[in-house]
A protein has these predicted regions:
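Catalytic cores of RNA-modifying enzymes
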Residues: 1-204, 243-248, 256-258
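C-terminal lobe and adjacent flexible extensions of AdoMet/dcAdoMet transferase-like proteins
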Residues: 186, 204-258
Length: 258
């Protein structure tokens, strides 16, 4: 047996050790018949050993050299790329679409999500372990304090379900926070709005979340009568649904084109 890997604080490592959580998380790859999956940060392979049993094309990306060496001894047939997921050209890893799964390091979990969004045409599904607070934020709906930028941007492209809540004892070393697994299934509909503008509108609206939209979105220079005649502009960002934000993006784009 290979020598155990010591978790490295600077990499934000908390190795999963709970077999039930690992098996239930691995089972999520069966949900939408995605043929290929990439695991981020397999560590010592507690989740990985369930994934390699699945009838899928499977690869892993791991930044920690010690973990890569451990996996090479324990799972010699597993293809592990020693690299930083955030700096990896993930489009070149498979010949077609693939899902993303893993116990995501909490200090970069939002960055991982944004990379998935950037490659959403290639990534039809993802399943990840997040800090519970972040997971709830991603899954949150409007009129809720936890509803924010991540909620809207992710839910515009993926249907989100919060699958499992996980206690700190499921990890080594145990984190100081609760965790959760969320699953995202891509929404298969045509994106008929300006995505770059949509991101800008959402981020701008929530950066001043206590202000009404008529004040928070001043930088877009909408005509005053548009703001006065549309009830949406009397609301705050947290009151708008994802579809409201898409409609708002259409409206702003329409007036920018005039």
């Amino acid at each position: 047996m290979a020598k155990q890997v010591r978790a490295k604080k600077f990499l934000g490592q908390h190795f999963l050790r709970d077999e039930y959580v690992a098996e239930q998380t691995a089972n999520l790859v069966d949900r939408d018949a995605v043929p290929s999956w990439l695991e981020i940060g397999p560590g010592m392979g507690v989740l990985t050993k369930y994934l390699v049993q699945k009838p899928i094309e499977f690869k892993a990306v791991e930044l920690d050299r010690d973990s890569v060496a451990y996996l090479a001894k324990e799972m010699p047939s597993l293809e592990v790329l020693e690299a930083d997921f955030l700096k990896t050209d993930i489009e070149s890893l498979f010949n077609g679409p693939f899902g993303v799964i893993g116990n995501f390091p909490y200090n970069i979990s939002s960055q991982i999500l944004f990379k998935i969004l950037d490659h959403r045409q290639t990534v039809p599904a993802f399943a990840g372990m997040f800090q519970l607070e972040v997971a709830k934020r991603i899954a949150s709906g409007p009129n809720n304090k936890t509803y924010g930028i991540l909620s809207v941007l992710v839910q515009a492209f993926y249907t989100i379900t919060l699958e499992i809540e996980i206690p700190p004892t499921a990890f080594v070393p145990p984190p100081k926070v609760q965790s959760a697994v969320i699953y995202g299934a891509r929404i298969e509909q045509e994106v008929d709005w300006n995505v770059k503008l949509f991101f800008d509108v959402v981020k701008t609206a929530f950066q001043q979340r206590r202000k009404t939209l008529s004040n928070a979105l001043k930088k877009f220079n909408l005509p005053k009568e548009v703001c006065l005649n549309n009830q949406m502009f009397k609301l705050r960002a947290e009151n708008l649904s994802v579809s409201d934000f898409i409609g708002l993006t259409h409206l702003i784009e329409q007036h920018q084109a005039q």
